[in-house]
Amino acid sequence: MNLPEGTYRIRNVDSGLVLQLEGASRVRVGPDGPPAPTAARRWLIAPVHSGGGIFHMVSEDNERRLDVANASTESGARVQVWRANAFGAQEWIVEEHLDAPGVVSLIACISGLPLEADAEGRVRQGEDTDSPSQWWRLEPA
């Protein structure tokens, strides 16, 4: 996907909630407003390599990258933020849904599994079910 580098809110299609940082490393979805500070709901999305289609997603709040915990390849592994490193657990493919303009899936390069949010607001990677809990909108912030 040709995605311009920039700062975005990442909104879950199913719940309408935004991806946000809680504390130092915990990532959840929550309302687009208090109690989370604005920076905790904003993500710099930048290509890993120019033209490669793989991206880092960096929290504006603490400048840490969206990361699959322990570089897990298992379905259900939690997603967090972590300091920059050279592992594929911090690299994401932004896959556009051609049948739903503006909707994307965020695929973890380490596992090939999509980012999803559950009903309790937890964020993890999971088996691809092609469901709205795994669909996201990238809204320029």
Regions found by a protein language model. Name each.
Residues 1-141:
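Lectin-like carbohydrate-binding module/patch detector with strong preference for beta-trefoil
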